[in-house]
A protein has these predicted regions:
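Positively charged n-region of N-terminal signal peptides that target proteins for export
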Residues: 1-8
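Bacterial N-terminal signal peptides
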Residues: 9-17
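Acidic, metal/ion-coordinating pockets
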Residues: 22-334
Length: 334
């Protein structure tokens, strides 16, 4: 009897192991624009991001929305600005320039954010010096980065997830950088490619034709999920050509200003599903957020939206989408 029981247990173990090898999930949390710093001309202002972080500590910013970032497999945000200890290379002719201390990578680490997109218009605020300092700070802090021809591949549970990104201005000049990013990630054997696009018109609640062109090109050349940033407000979600497009996630931790035009934003948790070693599709879990927990003041600490705020943000997403929007949405792989 004991031998028969042992054989049954062994059979169950083999069956369970085989099923586990055939199916799997990878959870990726996606957040929007993050300025971990402040404007250069505000450095001595007593209410800046720098002053608050010195007082509250690195864990302050994400403390109210930390759970999805800390319990997932990978997290991605758009890092708007430079991490550099001095102002060398400052492009004084730009209207807005953002700089934070290189030590602020600890904000990402404590929040559980492993990947950042740097393909945006503020990564260049302090010229070559700022770009080099930012990459060095991210590397020293253990954060992966992608964008501007840099690519990142993260392997989870045997599945390779690829990251890259492109600015709208770059794409309009030439498509080769995006094409080469996607070609590289496909050749590297990525099972899923998440591509960041810094695009669109600031504070527009609707995506435009240029965003559509970029998304279609990215998906046509291998992107599975396209993540939009730059408009600083939420936009819709669509399925195009077998890929998923998040037109704009809005701001998240935004140290660049005290006075926000809008506090509405979105965090999305993408649960990637695999079977027989192949990507099957993604479940998107929508988490509306407000970029400050002390409105109308910006205290650089987002919180999850509830009640009427939640409903309003979901409606804004619906208004810019061609499909029904809900808290959880399944998209089958192409």
């Amino acid at each position: 009897m004991q031998k028969k029981t042992a054989l049954v247990c062994l059979a169950c173990l083999i069956l369970c192991t085989s099923a586990s090898a055939l199916a799997g999930e990878v959870t990726v949390t996606l957040g929007g624009d993050c300025v971990l710093g402040t404007r250069e001309e505000w450095k001595k202002d007593p209410e800046t991001f720098d002053t608050l972080i010195a007082e509250k500590g690195y864990g302050w910013c994400f403390s109210k929305i930390a759970e999805p970032f800390q319990t997932d497999d990978i997290s991605l945000i758009n890092l708007e600005g430079v991490l550099q200890s001095g102002s060398q290379g400052h492009q004084r002719g730009k209207q807005f320039t953002f700089r934070g201390d290189p030590a602020y990578t600890a904000i990402l680490t404590e929040a559980g954010i492993e990947q950042v997109n740097i393909a945006n218009n503020h990564y260049i605020d302090f010229s070559r010096s700022g770009r080099e300092s930012t990459r060095a700070a991210l590397e020293a802090g253990g954060s992966g980065f992608s964008g501007y021809t840099y690519r990142s591949i993260v392997e989870v549970n045997g599945y390779k997830i690829g990251f890259a990104g492109c600015r709208e201005t770059t794409f309009l000049e030439r498509k080769a950088p995006m094409y080469n990013d996607l070609k590289y990630l496909k050749k590297a054997g990525c099972d899923v490619i998440i591509y960041s696009c810094h695009w669109g018109k600031e504070y527009s609640p609707t995506h435009n034709q240029t965003q559509i062109r970029m998304a279609d090109y990215a998906i046509k050349n291998g992107a599975d999920i396209v993540v939009g940033t730059h408009p600083h407000c939420v936009q819709g979600i669509d399925e195009r050509g077998g890929g998923v497009v998040l037109w704009s996630l809005g701001n998240l931790v935004f140290g660049g200003t005290h006075d926000m035009t809008t506090f509405d934003a979105l965090v999305v948790q993408a649960v990637l599903s695999f079977e027989n070693g192949k990507y099957q599709g993604v479940t998107l879990k929508l988490m509306p957020v407000l970029t400050s927990s002390d409105r109308p003041r910006n205290n650089f600490q987002p919180e999850f939206a509830t009640g009427g705020d939640y409903d309003r943000i979901m409606q804004l997403i619906q208004d810019d989408s061609t499909l029904p929007i809900g808290p959880e949405m399944w998209f089958e792989a192409k």
